Every structure is written in structure tokens, then in C-alpha cells.
Amino acid sequence: MIKKRNTTKISVIGAGSVGATTAYALMLSGVATEIVLVDVNKAKTEGEAMDLSHGADFVKPVNILSGDYKDTEGSDIVVITAGAAQKVGETRLQLINKNINIFKSIIPEVVKYNKDAILLVVSNPVDVLSYVTYKLSGFPKERVIGSGTVLDTSRLKHEIGKRYKIDPRNVNTYIMGEHGDSEIATWSVTNIQNIKIDEYANKENLEYNDNFRKEVYENVKNAAYEVINRKGATFYAIALAVTRIVKAILGDEKTILPVSTLVENYYGIKDVYLGMPCIVGGSGIEKALSIDLNKTEASKLVKSAETLKNTLNNASGL
């Protein structure tokens, strides 16, 4: 449980596009009194910290530092964004061997100085690396969280909201499973302010059929690739997603977010990290919710879990 105190310290490991933008989003949110940036590129890390610090007059009081792992000591949350970036045409799972080796050097250092912190993994492939972090850290599963499908779920809400011309915040739904190509859309539980989506579409004379679901799902699944093809990387939306998770933890909100967590017995799925609706609060993941899926969705979720397990089993360096 995050202890209530006058200061809140968040460390961000990795000061690339995602890490630096996450630090910026955290700074704007006002949730932290201290943010520490750590990266192998010392000069860039110092530059990012300087640039952020120069905006201190425009936000709540916050101390932005660059440093090494010792400077992260006593962090409430350690956000891990370090790793090889996803290139054009490269899947998240193809990043695995590069990033496992990076994590084998990062996690022991993080744990050395932060025995009581919550670890929030963002680097891709996030589900696999969350599992790797869980194993390397020795932390309880509640305190090792992956950003999971929080961003994918936001993308799904955006797509539905755009097509139906409604506020995406009024769309209740989840993307579950891998944060990647095998993720699933939970159409069977999707609703618009507690009205089932098929009923809402019928009442409002809107499209909702197999073609609609396929188009929306493909747009969500391929969203990162489309952004990467155009600008080289995704970082704004994931930074906002990470900030949302951090706020839920620090505020002990007990809100439901589809983060990546260790699944132990859900439709026969065990010993793998997957994006699942979870109650997120001061102790991290307080409970994973076993929502009822239809047969097709459950089957796809099992396949998603198998994909991730096979990737772990085939990865080098584990």
C-alpha cells in the first residue's frame, strides 16, 4: 500500500520518447513532488530533466532530476519504459530478446533501491516483460503491473465514439489479452452508458454488424503501426495511459483498468501476464475481475495467452 505522506516520488527508467513524454505527463498531472529520470544516455537524460524543470513555474511544485539507480531510492512507483524501440514493420513480440537482456540489467538495480515500490512496466512487449519483471524482481504479483491494454481500450472507445458521434468516455468496453496482434475486443460486454451496444445501435439506427466490428477491431489493433509508419513512434497516448494508472495507484482509487497482470485461473489460463480488467488502488492490483466472455472471445483469449507463453518459452536469455 502506498503510504500517505507529504512527498510522492516517481522514477522513470528510460528517457526516450515514451519515458520523457511520460515524465512530462506526470509533471502536468501534479501527482508527484519528485520525478527522477534514469537512462544509459546520461546527456539526453540531463537535457530532458533540464527542459522539464524550466517549466516548473507553470505546474504544481515538483522536483525533476536526472540520475542513476541510487537516485531512485524510496520511489513510490518505478515506471519502466527502457528498451529497444519498435521499428517500422516490427511486431511487439519481435522485440523480446533485445528487451529481456536489457531488463536483466535494469530490474536488479531497481529492486536494490526500491524494495517497497510498485513497478509499472511499459516497455514492449509489455505482457512478456511484465512477467519477466515479476520473475526477476521477486515482488508479489500485485506490485508488478503492466500498462496492458489500457491504451488499446482507449483506442477502441475512440473508434466507437467517432463512428457513433458520442463522447468515447460514455463507451464501456475492454480490449483484453496481449497488448498486440492477438488482443481481443470484448463486444459481448460493450455498452453505451449501460445500454448494450447492439441495442443502442438498433435504437439510434446506427451500424453494428460483423463488418463494423471487424473494421473497428482492425483499426484498434493496427493503430500503433499506423502511427509508427507516419511519425516513427507512439508516445503521447501511452504517456497519458501510464499517468492514468499512476493516479489510480497514488489516489487509492480502486478503479477498474485493463492492466497487465498475472493470470492464475481464468478460462484455464495460468502463469502468464495478460491485459485484464483489474481493480487498481494503493497496493497496486487489488483484484483481477473474471468477466464473462462469450465462447468466441474466450477462445481468442486462450489463444492470445498461448501466443505469449510460446514467446516466453522460445525467448533466449530466460
UniProtKB/Swiss-Prot annotation:
It comes from the Bacteria. The modification Phosphotyrosine is found at Y225. It is an enzyme of class 1 (oxidoreductase). Substrate binds at Q86, R92, N124, P125, V126, D127, D152, T153, S154, R155, T234. Coiled coil: none annotated. The keyword NAD applies. CDD domains: LDH_2. GO terms for cellular component: cytoplasm. Pfam families: Ldh_1_C, Ldh_1_N. NAD(+) binds at V18, D39, K44, Y69, G83, A84, S105, V122, S123, N124, S147. It is found in: Cytoplasm. Its EC number is 1.1.1.27. It catalyses: (S)-lactate + NAD(+) = pyruvate + NADH + H(+). Keywords: Cytoplasm, NAD, Oxidoreductase, Phosphoprotein. The active site is at H179. Catalyzes the conversion of lactate to pyruvate. Belongs to the LDH/MDH superfamily. LDH family. NCBIfam families: L-LDH-NAD, PRK00066.1, PRK06223.1. Homotetramer. This is L-lactate dehydrogenase. It comes from Clostridium botulinum (strain Okra / Type B1). The lineage of its organism: Bacteria, Bacillati, Bacillota, Clostridia, Eubacteriales.
